[in-house]
Design a protein with these regions (language model features):
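N-terminal helix-turn-helix DNA-binding module of bacterial transcription factors
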Residues: 1-62, 339
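Alpha-helical recognition/docking segments in bacterial nutrient-uptake
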Residues: 1-2, 60-177
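Short beta-strand segments enriched in small/hydrophobic residues
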Residues: 13, 18-23, 57-73, 123, ...
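Hinge/beta->alpha junction and helix N-cap segments in small-molecule ligand-binding domains
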Residues: 70-79, 97-106, 128, 154, ...
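Short helix-capping segments at alpha-helix termini
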Residues: 90-91, 209-217, 243-246, 268-273
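Short acidic capping loops at alpha-helix termini that bridge into adjacent secondary structure
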Residues: 185-186, 216-220, 273-278
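Flexible loop/turn connectors
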Residues: 238-340
Length: 340
């Protein structure tokens, strides 16, 4: 039994937080005597042997954090990895990066590899790690029984899993609603992912229509299945919608590269931006400044999220009780592609 016990099991049986168990193991004075006795009794009963994480920042800590990223060629994910790695280094932690791809089995294998390296924690970058099927997420829950798992821009309710995310639903809703209130009804929503974040953004677009007593037309919700590098493919995709008779006065997108492709479509059809067509991107990446006119985009506070994630990680490892979910609000950065 003792070999199977984890700090999570101890906290559950004692009815206290993981951070409290860690403080007991570290001999912290900031624990009530009654609570300390309860935790120690359970530890003695099961012969629990704490690892480096359970003791917090102990001598056996590897001072190494694993980072999982599906695709390092993606601008958003690459920038997130940069911010996280930089903040870890500033806190005297090393990092090990695994680029997993998008297949679940590959993600599982990469996580298993990091666990075998005895990292102190694992950061999962991006919402694509959380799937709709609960069974597909079980490997994350299992890993969290031994080390804290940090999710960036994803939400998963499980013990020892900490989520730092942007309210993509509200950000997309607000962006869409700004166009509706300016008098535009025919708004194309262009997206490229059905991930957790992707679904929240789509729901935000739909909610903006419902909140203004307008019908949601599925024809105006279009998913581009191509690569995030295929901007020409985006242009051709929007062109086909136009050629098939779909008319729109604005385009809200889930990613900046989609907005760039939409801009190229407008120019090819001599549609003036923003007079004839208004365009909104998402992520406020460098791509917004590489387009003419420059693109209005939602800033999802990526750097702030990464700083908070590392702060939560360091606090958790040191035995401090940290919030399991931190949510940031997006901000619409208005530029030349809109008139709202």
């Amino acid at each position: 039994m003792s070999n199977q016990m984890t700090i999570y099991d101890i906290s559950k049986k004692a009815g206290v937080s993981i951070a409290t168990v860690s403080r007991v193991l570290n001999g912290s004075s900031n624990v009530k005597p009654k609570t300390r006795k309860k935790v120690m009794d359970i530890i003695d009963q099961y012969g629990y042997k704490p690892n480096a994480f359970a003791r917090g920042l102990g001598l056996n800590s590897m001072k190494t954090i694993g980072i999982l990223c599906a695709d390092s060629s993606d601008l958003y994910l690459a920038k997130a990895v940069y911010f996280i790695e930089r903040n870890l280094r500033e806190n005297e932690y090393n990092s090990v990066l695994c680029c997993t791809g998008y297949e679940v089995e590959d993600k599982k294998e990469s996580l298993k590899l990091l666990l075998s390296q005895h990292v102190d924690s694992v950061v999962m970058v991006g919402s694509n790690f959380i799937l709709n099927d609960a069974e597909e997420n079980q490997y994350i829950k299992d890993a969290a029984e031994s080390i804290p798992i940090m999710l960036l821009n994803a939400d998963y309710d499980a013990p020892n899993v900490y989520c730092t995310l942007c309210d993509d639903f509200k950000a997309t809703q607000d962006a869409t609603e700004a166009l509706i209130k300016s008098g535009i009804d025919d708004i194309l929503y262009l997206y490229n992912s059905r991930s957790y974040s992707g679904q929240k953004k789509l729901a935000g677009y739909q909610s903006a229509y419902l909140a203004n007593d307008k019908l949601v037309n599925k024809d105006y919700q279009q998913c581009f299945e191509g690569s995030h590098e295929d901007i020409e493919g985006v242009t051709a995709f929007v062109q086909k919608l136009w050629d098939d008779g779909l008319r729109f006065k604005a385009i809200v997108t889930s990613e900046d590269f989609l907005a760039v492709g939409a801009t190229k479509f407008a120019k090819a059809n001599k549609l003036s931006i923003p007079k004839d067509l208004q365009i909104i991107g998402y992520n406020d990446s460098v791509l917004t400044l590489c387009s003419e006119p420059s693109l209005t985009s939602v800033n999802n506070r990526l750097e702030d999220m990464c700083i908070q994630l590392v702060k939560t990680l360091i606090g958790t490892l040191s035995g401090t009780e940290m919030p399991q979910k931190t949510i940031f609000s997006g901000e619409l950065i208005k530029r030349g592609s809109t008139d709202i």
